[in-house]
């Protein structure tokens, strides 16, 4: 995929940061020495970590140059590293690995979570939040439009960009086997947006990227118009024109024994 767009992502900065704050609130650590923000994006979650743990050595890691440029401008005193999470290995065992809205882009969660858990210092925590919305209308309709002419051939692989999440039982079993105690929960946020275009703008910064990147500008516009029309049928507006977007997310905090 093309590089991420920090400005597009931050159009909904408050809504995207709230789950990170909710995840951090459940991390049972008082004074970790080493904290790594995996998939730190533009630094919104990193700022929360720095505020919660002011004495920790906090590192932000991301594969997007655009996201990292924004993060470095926001938090010049923090160390940010450009790296692919799939092959990342820390120099020293971290006390906290914090992964807000990033692991859904990576495959093999059984192997991935076991590998991350093994990186932790004894007593350390892996804290993860992932969107769990692939069966919401916002995402089902992406796939439906992608399967229609004239997009189908070019977007045949787009739906595979996101990993389908496991069940609570799966994540508990995988992390328990890796020597962790596990705290799991699921929350559905309900976001009021300014019409159906608001949903388009939201997912354009994340979930729509695999569907738009293979298309030229004219076909992108055609795809978005058809997608927005489908959203209008799936999300009836409120009396004042607002549209409510339910957004389920899966959370886990695993602590190494």
From Swiss-Prot:
<comment type="function">
    <text>Catalyzes the S-adenosylmethionine monomethyl esterification of trans-aconitate.</text>
</comment>
<dbReference type="Pfam" id="PF13649">
    <property type="entry name" value="Methyltransf_25"/>
</dbReference>
<dbReference type="InterPro" id="IPR029063">
    <property type="entry name" value="SAM-dependent_MTases_sf"/>
</dbReference>
<keyword id="KW-0949">S-adenosyl-L-methionine</keyword>
<dbReference type="InterPro" id="IPR041698">
    <property type="entry name" value="Methyltransf_25"/>
</dbReference>
<dbReference type="GO" id="GO:0005737">
    <property type="term" value="C:cytoplasm"/>
</dbReference>
<dbReference type="GO" id="GO:0032259">
    <property type="term" value="P:methylation"/>
</dbReference>
<protein>
    <recommendedName>
        <fullName>Trans-aconitate 2-methyltransferase</fullName>
        <ecNumber>2.1.1.144</ecNumber>
    </recommendedName>
</protein>
<dbReference type="InterPro" id="IPR023149">
    <property type="entry name" value="Trans_acon_MeTrfase_C"/>
</dbReference>
<keyword id="KW-0963">Cytoplasm</keyword>
<keyword id="KW-0808">Transferase</keyword>
<dbReference type="InterPro" id="IPR023506">
    <property type="entry name" value="Trans-aconitate_MeTrfase"/>
</dbReference>
<keyword id="KW-0489">Methyltransferase</keyword>
<dbReference type="GO" id="GO:0030798">
    <property type="term" value="F:trans-aconitate 2-methyltransferase activity"/>
</dbReference>
<comment type="similarity">
    <text>Belongs to the methyltransferase superfamily. Tam family.</text>
</comment>
